[in-house]
Amino acid sequence: MAKTFSSICFTTLLLVVLFISTEIPKSEAHCDHFLGEAPVYPCKEKACKSVCKEHYHHACKGECEYHGREVHCHCYGDYH
């Protein structure tokens, strides 16, 4: 009984790891198109992400990045 339970746990764990490893790169790979800048001053990561979602509905991430000497909130998304 313990051997069967151990085998089921290992198989389940393997399937979960396989599912996670294939889905994460797909979602991040589609989020590389620059959509524009969002007005967040000073730029904070959480605020940048939420403002990007407000301004660009198909934004999947917002990052604070240097643009010249200033930090700006850049919004990224994908087009289907």
Curated annotation (Swiss-Prot):
Keyword Transit peptide: no
Positions of disulphide bridges: 43-64, 48-73, 52-75
Gene Ontology annotations for the cellular component aspect, listed alphabetically: extracellular region; secretory vesicle
Signal sequence coordinates: 1-29
Key words, A-Z: Antimicrobial, Disulfide bond, Fungicide, Plant defense, Secreted, Signal
Domain of life: Eukaryota
GO biological process, one term: killing of cells of another organism
Keyword Secreted: yes
Compartments in which it is found: Secreted
Coiled coil: none
Chief location: secreted
Family the entry assigns: Belongs to the DEFL family.
Protein name, UniProt field: Defensin-like protein 204
Source species of the chain: Arabidopsis thaliana
